[in-house]
Amino acid sequence: MNNAVKEQLAELGIEGYLNQHQHKSLLRFLTCGSVDDGKSTLIGRLLHDSKQIYEDQLAAVHNDSQRVGTTGSRPDLALLVDGLQAEREQGITIDVAYRYFSTQKRKFIIADTPGHEQYTRNMATGASTCDLAVILIDARKGVLDQTRRHSFISNLLGLKHFIVAVNKMDLVDYSQDRFEQIRAEYLEFSKHLQGETEIQIIPLSALEGDNVVEKSRLMDWYQGPSLLELLENVDIDRDKSSGAFRFPVQYVNRPNLDFRGFAGTIASGVVKVGDKIKALPSGKTSTVTRIVTFDGDLPQAQAGLAVTLTLADEIDISRGDLIVLESAQVDSTNHLLADVVWMTEQPLQVGRDYDIKIAGKKTVGQVKAVRHQYDINNLSTYHAESLPLNGIGLCEWTFTQTVALDKYLDCADTGGFIIIDRLTNVTVGAGLVRDSLQNITGQTESFSAFELELNALVRKHFPHWQAIDLSRLGKA
């Protein structure tokens, strides 16, 4: 038991502590930035100064600091996060490391992401579940290519809150001029980011603890809050509940003949008993009669809650369908534009079939064309025929089924999909819907009947050849 928990138990008692803890909001955030900007040290300092470290953990850090530490005689707090042996020996982060802690105001899950360009896929994976990004900048080096790259990926993945932490201020004598110079440089770069992003910029020193949990006496020219205060007070619940109601059906719950409900997690918005809804892609309508949870029925439910909805009418709804309000305008298409983050050594192939999972629905899709690939260091684009490992590009997709979806920036759960290799069942990429295109319905005779039959035979008996389906290349 750490000191923070001991203090809260002594003040509130067990029942009071559990009740308070249960009703705290949860903030998921990631730390990112260039190599050696101090991401792991910052998390270690945050955990240490907020009294979240157990005594045996602190003792282990003291011992490990003598062997692989980088802070001299002082304990290397980065070792609280860098768990892999290779990370500790190299002094870098390779995998995404997750840490949990809580304060009296809020619960937190931290994703410590790697800074190296070859681990872009790891960083994208960490960002996909977060609400906020803490982007570190070394006060000595300023805004680097990797800073721009991580800002771009975080923005691409829909994060609407950035805290830019100008770290290592102790190494520039806590200079206000240097901080203002970096602040102006980053704000100028941020004009190229899409959507509305709330950006807070703060000077700190993770090694010394300045402006991490407590305000710094050495930077009295900075009048804003500390990092922990910013994390405790950022409003993320408004973002989740302000969107349109989206409910991807994960399971049809039929325990007996008298009950039929549709289970899932509300992706965005709010639903109330009595709301008129429609199911997509069928378009059938009904009315919500109950909102069932483990703790009993609710009059209304908002984004993030796992619920079971019962309806007034027996309409056909199955796993993968999307329930929305009757008045909602939702795109249903099999043809779309999506940004793709590629995560495997074998490049993305135009025309090859991949399994697609989007909001509980499974279908098959293929890339008709790569519109462009991003240079994620300077946000420019260039022509590409495919996407390599860690490549990010805008692709034109076709699916075998019509899918109800949103733009990723509007709703991540119904606008994001994963791409799976059909032979190995390995997740090879992630897609972020940019826009829907006109449905593809027709097919032209581009190949002879013999060519199509031979192609089907090869794909059936020699799947490891990964032959392209010719019958789909002729779709208009």
Curated annotation (Swiss-Prot):
Pfam families registered for this protein in UniProt: GTP-eEF1A_C, GTP_EFTU, GTP_EFTU_D2
PROSITE patterns found in the cross-reference section: G_TR_1, G_TR_2
Region (G2): 91-95
Keyword Nucleotidyltransferase: yes
Region (G5) residue spans: 205-207
Keyword hit for GTP-binding: yes
Catalyses which reaction(s): sulfate + ATP + H(+) = adenosine 5'-phosphosulfate + diphosphate
Entry binding sites for GTP: 33-40, 112-116, 167-170
HAMAP family: Sulf_adenylyltr_sub1
Name listed for the protein in its UniProt record: Sulfate adenylyltransferase subunit 1
Protein species of origin: Vibrio cholerae serotype O1 (strain ATCC 39541 / Classical Ogawa 395 / O395)
